[in-house]
């Protein structure tokens, strides 16, 4: 399967899986004064990594329509026949780093790094999950 060429990827699956991610350090260095917290989304996906960046009394409400999930993850989901909720528990779904900032900080971050998108908001947690997908 790894050596199979997929038109939607324009390469073999194995090649797509080994493309290095963008280094975050130079970008974060530019906006560190506006960052309140951050989460590197690695194994465990958003569901397991983002809560580590939040105090107990807060939750992150994530708007799933705020970014385009890369075709690689859509293809993996189809090939593995995995539920989308499971995908968010395992993969970063295209979000390798999540920064948490105030509204004003987010505006400043976007003025410096225009590729940064707002994917949700932090809210008080009244029990329940610490990451809410909607």
Residue ranges and their predicted role:
Residues 5-134:
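Glycine-/charge-enriched secondary-structure boundary and capping motifs
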């Amino acid at each position: 399967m790894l050596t199979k060429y997929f038109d939607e990827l324009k390469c073999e699956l194995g090649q797509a899986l080994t493309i290095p991610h963008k280094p975050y350090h130079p970008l974060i260095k530019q906006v560190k004064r506006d960052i309140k917290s951050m989460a590197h989304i690695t194994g465990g996906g958003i569901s397991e990594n983002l809560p580590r960046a939040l105090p107990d009394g807060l939750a992150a409400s994530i708007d799933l329509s705020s970014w385009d999930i890369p075709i690689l993850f859509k293809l993996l989901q189809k090939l593995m026949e995995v539920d989308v909720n499971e995908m968010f528990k395992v993969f970063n779904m295209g979000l390798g780093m999540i920064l948490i900032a105030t509204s004003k900080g987010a505006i400043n971050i976007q003025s410096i790094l225009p590729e940064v998108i707002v994917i949700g908001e932090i809210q008080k947690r009244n029990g329940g999950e610490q990451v809410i997908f909607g």
